[in-house]
Every structure is written in C-alpha cells, then in structure tokens.
Amino acid sequence: MPTIQQLVRKGRKDKKAKVKTAALKGSPQRRGVCTRVYTTTPKKPNSALRKVARVRLTSGIEVSAYIPGEGHNLQEHSMVLVRGGRVKDLPGVRYRIIRGSLDTQGVKDRKQARSRYGAKKEK
C-alpha cells in the first residue's frame, strides 16, 4: 500500500485494455491474400466442418479468418477483406472475411440478413 507522499509523486497508472484484433493495427478492416483455405471442426458440444482461410494481411501478419455463410468461392491467392469478430467454437479464429467484397462473392439465394452476407436484393 503506497503512502500519500508516494501517490503525490507517482500517481496511479491506468490499466491498458487488451486489444482483441491486434493484426488489424487499429483499422476497421484489412485487405489480405488467402494462403490456405480449409475446413476445421469446432470445440466440444458442437459438430460441423467450419470453413476457414489462412490470410496474409497487408500489415504483414498472417491470421485465421472464418468464412461465414453457405458455400464460398475462395481459393489460394484470393483477395479478401477481413474484419474483427471471433468464432466462439473455433479456437484461434478471431477474424471474419467480409462477403461480397473484393474476390469474395456474396451468399447465393440469401433472403434475410442479406447485408451481412453481401447478397443483392432479388428482383
């Protein structure tokens, strides 16, 4: 416990909040190139084949990013836009690929929540 004199001299230091999306370097999104596109299985109570891409960002960092929605057209060397947002049942996946931008196509035949999946309005 510091004395009042020590507090007058030094003061209290504020704790730094931990950055959850360090690879984006403070940007809302980052462009990157897919180095590997693969499927992986989720943590214990869930069961599926989740689509994930390994992406080298323009910041020079390589991250794992989740590909949301049903079906995708991504392969190695595809240009993608990456945003923050983890996938709770995939350990180590803290980023998501934005559908409908750069080389990523939107989800086909999507009727609801279209803006999240880059799907155009059906005529």
UniProtKB/Swiss-Prot annotation:
The gene is rpsL. SUPFAM superfamilies: Nucleic acid-binding proteins. Belongs to the universal ribosomal protein uS12 family. It comes from Corynebacterium kroppenstedtii (strain DSM 44385 / JCM 11950 / CIP 105744 / CCUG 35717). Keywords: Methylation, Ribonucleoprotein, Ribosomal protein, RNA-binding, rRNA-binding, tRNA-binding. InterPro entries: NA-bd_OB-fold, Ribosomal_uS12, Ribosomal_uS12_bac. This is Small ribosomal subunit protein uS12. It comes from the Bacteria. One of its GO terms (cellular component) is small ribosomal subunit.
